[in-house]
Amino acid sequence: MVPQALLFVPLLVFPLCFGKFPIYTIPDKLGPWSPIDIHHLSCPNNLVVEDEGCTNLSGFSYMELKVGYILAIKMNGFTCTGVVTEAENYTNFVGYVTTTFKRKHLRPTPDACRAAYNWKMAGDPRYEESLHNPYPDYSWLRTVKTTKESLVIISPSVADLDPYDRSLHSRVFPSGKCSGVAVSSTYCSTNHDYTIWMPENPRLGKSCDIFTNSRGKRASKGSETCGFVDERGLYKSLKGACKLKLCGVLGLRLMDGTWVAMQTSNETKWCPPDQLVNLHDFRSDEIEHLVVEELVRKREECLDALESIMTTKSVSFRRLSHLRKLVPGFGKAYTIFNKTLMEADAHYKSVRTWNEILPSKGCLRVGGRCHPHVNGVFFNGIILGPDGNVLIPEMQSSLLQQHMELLESSVIPLVHPLADPSTVFKDGDEAEDFVEVHLPDVHNQVSGVDLGLPNWGKYVLLSAGALTALMLIIFLMTCCRRVNRSEPTQHNLRGTGREVSVTPQTWKIISSWESHKSGGETRL
């Protein structure tokens, strides 16, 4: 017989399937009642079970999921967006330069994106330089365009890897899912036409590292394997197991929702699509730890109550409540009818909320209907109160449930800008706002007045300027010649020493201005 301390199936069935310890258990199937003596009372051992007489234990190795899986397998990745920055320079006639920057998108290639990502992660200055605005060229009276291609890497961008079909899930993908990442195709399209998603590690197999090797003991009967004792000493049955692949690895999904990869000779069917593997994380391990502590404490309380019953030779409803099975599965139910101790076989199910078994006043739901009482007595210490309400002793004990609520926490992950469903993309290929924050600022640089003439206007202006300059030169040359001719004549007149003044009326010659001034005036 397998040692009872190693058989632990009921404990694992509940917490791994439901994630929380039940606030209560109640029979969903209840056999006929039969009278018993107090010496037939026993405390249920909620930690043990016996399995089909598999007594042969042998050491073996198996593979199971690591702690932390498989709620979601995170695959780190990055997005790559192609951007073209265009610098347009116009130099006008007077030499002023106007520079205008424009940004558009281009479709990136996976190889170029991988190289840009490696540059960024390695701190290579080539990545930052690739994001700088182009140095514009210029030419007088011409418009010169200079373009520069850049790849904007935004990381991290985390996607969830589905271990069942190895597809990726993220809101950055067009339909929320990408099935194209494989050896031949190492990128996914996104909900932006000029952005692709790529995994950080090009070796995709490393992203599905969710398994660990363990040692245990195989429990068998002849050539048939009934179950095994895992590395932690917990027994797990193979009854009801089905075949299921995770990340391409064939294994068995057990009835409690756990997954193992082990060699068996048993005929096993494939799991239907709705048979998935339960969560195995640190929180579930913590819950199992709390469950074990609670079950051990409850068993001690049950043994104390049983000892009190044997000592006092008397039974109370409150003491009978300690004999209830605390985990789903087969067990016993006890009650007192007409001062007679009664026992019945029962199959217990878990209760998550009290409303499940107390739908209305005076009704205790068992097996889908209100269970009848006998003089206000049900079973397992449950009675009908004077006011007509069903009284359950354990209803006031909610400490463990509070522990479960304390373990719950919410996490706000980093959201990639493309994952925002409210993002409105621009029409055409104009650069989007979400990449602008990763690029240097662009603005119009104006060094002076821009005449804004078309190409033919520039040549007309040039011709008019040349003609004006030629006419100005001719005019200046003409003026200079006239000035040079007048200067010799004036010089000759000053050289005679006397100035002659002619009066047309008298034709009389006045010798000089000095004689006229001294009084030699001749009257007509």
UniProtKB/Swiss-Prot annotation:
Question: What keywords does the record list, in alphabetical order?
Answer: Disulfide bond, Glycoprotein, Lipoprotein, Membrane, Palmitate, Signal, Transmembrane, Transmembrane helix, Viral envelope protein, Virion
Q: Where is the lipid attached (S-palmitoyl cysteine)?
A: C480
- Primary location group: virion
What Gene3D superfamilies does the record point to? 2.30.29.130
Q: Give an example GO biological process.
A: fusion of virus membrane with host endosome membrane
Query: Which range is the signal sequence, renumbered to this chain?
Result: 1-19
Task: List the ranges whose topology is Intravirion.
Answer: 481-524
Tell me how this protein assembles. Homotrimer. Interacts with matrix protein. Interacts with host TRFC. Interacts with host BST2; this interaction inhibits viral budding by tethering new virions to the cell surface. Interacts with ITGB1. Interacts with host GRM2.
Remarks, anything else? Arg-352 is highly involved in rabies virus pathogenicity. Its mutation dramatically attenuates the virus.
State what this protein does: Attaches the virus to host cellular receptor, inducing endocytosis of the virion by using different host proteins including TFRC, GRM2 and ITGB1. In the endosome, the acidic pH induces conformational changes in the glycoprotein trimer, which trigger fusion between virus and cell membrane. There is convincing in vitro evidence that the muscular form of the nicotinic acetylcholine receptor (nAChR), the neuronal cell adhesion molecule (NCAM), and the p75 neurotrophin receptor (p75NTR) bind glycoprotein and thereby facilitate rabies virus entry into cells.
Family assignment? Belongs to the lyssavirus glycoprotein family.
This chain belongs to which protein, by name? Glycoprotein
